[in-house]
A protein has these predicted regions:
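Conserved glycine-rich Rossmann-like NAD(P)H-binding loop of the short-chain dehydrogenase/reductase
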Residues: 27-36
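Rossmann-fold cofactor-recognition segment
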Residues: 43-54
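NAD(P)H-binding glycine-rich loop region in Rossmannoid oxidoreductase-like domains
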Residues: 52-95, 108
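NAD(P)-dependent short-chain dehydrogenase/reductase
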Residues: 126-135, 159-237, 250-252, 259-266
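Active-site helix of classical SDR
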Residues: 149, 153
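C-terminal substrate-binding subdomain of Rossmann-fold SDR/epimerase-dehydratase oxidoreductases
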Residues: 204-326
Length: 326
């Protein structure tokens, strides 16, 4: 009999890739989201469109004992969405409600194996002030002081899943994602992450033109390609690791240098102009010590390789949109 998996947030970037991976493993997969993925048809055997904030809907889709449940659904976006302050209440309310509903429904169905996608945004701001030496080791999460309400909600929900482990005998797993990117992800509209934003700006910019980058461009981040993320997610889900664990790359890069990488990939001659704008913490980089020790896992490719794939896909999307406008 086929194993059965549920992917919440299956219409999103990571969720869509995860559905495909699970199908390739031979799972029967149900996906659920507010919408279908706008860039590719779903590979799910069953796809339910609905609102995970609604308890009755959640109960209707968690109607059996799934072997694995992946809870990736959240109200999220890039710096332009998270750090303005205008979306704080929605972000906290919507994501917390989704997690409460999904986890309770899983518990009532006696589902043990639930994966929760947390984020590096839950790390304390005071440990990420130095762009050259950020501290994002898992044990540095407390004393807590995330730089956004998005991060605070992630921290709350981590504790929620771990509390269900302790009190109700569940086997929830928590992965802290560090800036996942790649094809089939949001690339415009304000919710895109930095790699997609840079690829879009460069793809749309004429040769000899100029792109804008928020802040001084010296803020640092690390970025993980989607295929690597899915591999680590599956490994953590099926491991005995009880604590939250980083899923990211240790290849740190300044945002200006990320823009320069996209420019170099394009082959264009483009200049960069730094402008005021939301930029988040000064430095953030995944510390992969735990996942390396526990699972012998590390990214298999450098950032440049993933950026080349992302640029190719986003450049094609820009061309398609331009043709549709004409």
């Amino acid at each position: 009999m086929k194993k059965r998996a549920l992917v919440c947030g299956a219409g999103g970037f990571i969720g869509g890739h995860l559905v495909t991976h699970l199908k390739n493993e031979g799972f029967w997969v149900r996906g659920v989201d507010l919408k279908y993925n706008e860039y590719a048809p779903t590979d799910a055997d069953d796809f339910a469109v609905g609102d995970l904030r609604e308890q009755d809907f959640v109960r209707s889709i968690i109607d059996q004992k799934f072997d694995e449940v992946y809870q990736l659904a959240a109200d999220m976006g890039g710096a332009g969405y998270i750090f303005t302050g205008e979306n704080d209440a929605d972000i906290m309310h919507n994501s917390a409600l989704i997690n409460l509903n999904v986890l309770e429904a899983c518990y009532k169905r006696n589902i043990k194996h639930v994966y929760y996608s947390s984020s590096a945004c839950m790390y304390p701001e005071h440990n990420q002030l130095d762009p050259d030496n950020p501290n994002c080791v898992e044990s540095s999460a407390y004393p807590a002081n995330p730089d956004s309400e998005y991060g605070w909600e992630k921290l709350f929900s981590e504790r929620l899943y771990l509390a269900f482990n302790r009190n109700y005998g569940m086997s929830c797993r928590v992965g802290r994602y560090h800036n996942i990117f790649g094809p089939l992800g949001t690339w415009q509209g304000g919710k895109e992450k930095a790699p997609a934003a840079m690829c879009r700006k460069v793809a749309m910019c004429p040769d000899g033109g100029e792109i804008e980058v928020w802040g001084d461009g010296k803020q640092t981040r690390s970025f993980l390609y989607i295929d690597e993320c899915i591999d680590a997610t599956i490994r953590i889900m099926r491991s005995d690791i009880l604590e939250p664990i980083n899923i990211g790359s240790e290849e740190m890069i300044a945002i200006n240098d990320l823009a320069k990488m996209a420019i170099d990939i394009s082959g264009k001659n483009i200049s960069i102009r730094n402008i005021p704008g939301p930029e988040g913490v000064r430095g953030r980089n995944s510390d992969n010590t735990l996942i390396r020790d526990y699972l012998s896992w590390a990214p298999s490719q450098p950032l440049r390789v993933g950026m080349e794939k992302a640029y190719k896909w986003i450049s094609a999307q820009v061309e398609i949109e331009a043709k549709n406008i004409i």
